[in-house]
């Protein structure tokens, strides 16, 4: 038996779905959630897992994602992800550098890291699809982040980070403000660096959608 449930799009990712969605999620063995706003960090998803439901969340998924990263060999994705996680678990500190000037470092607390392998096979498990990254909280990250190409705010150039929070932003020459600065002013909490991860899905390509881009092998 299967059932299709539609509901009005909420305002933000992580917003709770309206009734009867949470109760419906607990009634089935598997929930596949191709939504515009993510259900991953919701009580509805957590309660469904407690009831034994396997949940796959696919926020903002589109045809291009269906035809690329979702068709990956997920046993291979799992192998790469587990190896990457193993390297992280053996490390005390991570340092990220790029030719354009990025230089960031932070301590590794492996207990905060999650292996997003795409394997959602046991009762009560959940995952974000397409999958392919070990990710976690970069404790007290410090340094400089250079934005080579950032479509959301093309005028932004360099971000200074101290103790896990953005403290300064430099724009391209001749430009006084950026969309990123406006976002920081509107949502002060968005200055906090909440996640570090790197992609482990060989079939994921950069398309301008975070759901897939963060899973691309090499990012």
Cite the ranges covered by each PLM segment.
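B-type heme-binding environments
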Residues: 157
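Active-site bordering "gate/hinge" segments
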Residues: 1-154, 162, 171, 175, ...
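Solvent-exposed, well-ordered loop and adjacent helix/strand elements within mature globular domains
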Residues: 174-196
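Cysteine/selenocysteine-centered motifs that mediate thiol-based redox chemistry or coordinate metal-sulfur cofactors
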Residues: 189-219
